[in-house]
């Protein structure tokens, strides 16, 4: 009995935990993986749009400025070459000479004319004439290519600005995961919440267990991924995330934690990655938020503090208590041992039912016998007519 009480005591002595594991996914959702020795870098250029969107902001802005500046310089140089080849620069003071571009007297003027042409801000005293067919062709090319550059760069900037990454920053996960009893079964639980009043549509949750394993053939897999069921079969993984929800993984026979006791779990080396996905209500774009829990961040024998209260006509969420937990009596044995103990208890109760029924029947039989004796006494005392008198009548 003392051992059972110690097993359920939340304040029992905890074994030392393993520390120092390198995270696969950071708490803020960043994947702690760097791509090294990539030889086929040309593949990034085959999808230039995605490459530009994935760049850091300072690099994206630098590329944005360079794209426009280089096109202006390129076409400005061509305008200058046309003027130089036609001899327009040698007849600047000749009023009878018809240049390709009026008042284009040097490279700077050609550069400014290129900017005016590509940005369509309107011509000033520099304007193309109809005596320059090569200039007309170049004007058409610059107008078309300038529109393509505008569409490409503005599209990149728009997609980069409207990316739902910042929306994922308002989706929060509890700082710890907990293990405790729920409906008589051991469950691994964590909490998710949405700080915004605009909701995530079609929200779903997934969980992955990441740890190293070795196959029967001796192959070592350093980051083996195993799915943790969070209600896929029952539909509980589809969330209506209006208020914070506690996500539960029942530790059953299909769970990788089925044979893990408290001591074994705390000595294990693993990482639990949780992934929340959904569509942003305002934009319709898919959003994904991630977090992870190491062994040190899994609290055995704890439960989350309630954050939802009913006020006058509405529910209020107190996010100050979002990460808080409290200790509850929880067995230190594994879920398998707990299930076996419950099965033995159920079997004992099952086989004890017939014996209890037999005892009840015997008690009822003894009571009926005592009642019959009292009736006989009453008959003899004259409370009931004797059978002989009835026969005589």
From Swiss-Prot:
Q: Where is this site: Role in the control of polyamine-mediated channel gating and in the blocking by intracellular magnesium?
A: 150
A single MF term (Gene Ontology) = PDZ domain binding
Q: Which residues form a coiled coil?
A: none
- UniProt-annotated stretches for the region Disordered: 1-23, 360-393
Q: Does the keyword Transmembrane helix apply?
A: yes
Q: What does this protein do?
A: This receptor is controlled by G proteins. Inward rectifier potassium channels are characterized by a greater tendency to allow potassium to flow into the cell rather than out of it. Their voltage dependence is regulated by the concentration of extracellular potassium; as external potassium is raised, the voltage range of the channel opening shifts to more positive voltages. The inward rectification is mainly due to the blockage of outward current by internal magnesium. Unable to produce channel activity when expressed alone but forms a functional channel in association with KCNJ3/GIRK1.
Query: What domain notes does the record hold?
Result: The PDZ-binding motif specifically binds the PDZ domain of SNX27: the specificity for SNX27 is provided by the 2 residues located upstream (Glu-388 and Ser-389) of the PDZ-binding motif.
Would you identify the family this protein belongs to, as annotated?
Answer: Belongs to the inward rectifier-type potassium channel (TC 1.A.2.1) family. KCNJ9 subfamily.
Query: What is the protein's name according to its record?
Result: G protein-activated inward rectifier potassium channel 3
């Amino acid at each position: 009995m003392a051992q059972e009480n110690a097993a359920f005591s939340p304040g029992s002595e905890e074994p030392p935990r393993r520390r120092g594991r390198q995270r696969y996914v950071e708490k803020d959702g960043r994947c702690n993986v760097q791509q090294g020795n990539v030889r086929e870098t040309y593949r990034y250029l085959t999808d230039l749009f995605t490459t530009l969107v994935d760049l850091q902001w300072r690099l994206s802005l630098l590329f944005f400025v360079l794209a426009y500046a280089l096109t202006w310089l390129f076409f400005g140089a061509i305008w200058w070459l046309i003027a130089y080849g036609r001899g327009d620069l040698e007849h600047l003071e000749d009023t009878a000479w018809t240049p390709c571009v009026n008042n284009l007297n040097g490279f700077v003027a050609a550069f400014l004319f290129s900017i005016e042409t590509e940005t369509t801000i309107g011509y000033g005293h520099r304007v193309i004439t109809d005596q320059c067919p090569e200039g007309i062709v170049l004007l058409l090319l610059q107008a078309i290519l300038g529109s393509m550059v505008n569409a490409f760069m503005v599209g990149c900037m728009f997609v980069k600005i409207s990316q739902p990454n910042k929306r994922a920053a308002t989706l929060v996960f509890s700082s710890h995961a907990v293990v405790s009893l729920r409906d008589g079964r051991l469950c691994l639980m964590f909490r998710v919440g949405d700080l915004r009043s605009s909701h995530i549509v079609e929200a779903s949750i997934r969980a992955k267990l990441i740890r190293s394993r070795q196959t029967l053939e001796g192959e070592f897999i350093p980051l083996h991924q195993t799915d943790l069921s969070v209600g896929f079969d029952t539909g509980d993984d589809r969330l209506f995330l209006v208020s914070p929800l506690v996500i539960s993984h029942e530790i059953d026979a299909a769970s990788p934690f089925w044979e893990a006791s408290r001591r074994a779990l705390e000595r294990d080396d693993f990482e639990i990655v949780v992934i929340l996905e959904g569509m942003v209500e305002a934009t319709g774009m898919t959003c994904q938020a991630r977090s992870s829990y190491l062994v040190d961040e899994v609290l055995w024998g704890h439960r989350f503090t309630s954050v939802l209260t009913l006020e006058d006509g509405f529910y209020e969420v107190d996010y100050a208590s979002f990460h808080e937990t409290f200790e509850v009596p929880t067995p230190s044995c594994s879920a398998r041992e707990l299930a076996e103990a419950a099965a033995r208890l159920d079997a004992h109760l099952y086989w004890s039912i017939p014996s209890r029924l037999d005892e009840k029947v015997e008690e009822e039989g003894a009571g009926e016998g005592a009642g019959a004796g009292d009736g006989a006494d009453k008959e003899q005392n004259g409370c009931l007519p004797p059978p002989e008198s009835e026969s005589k009548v």
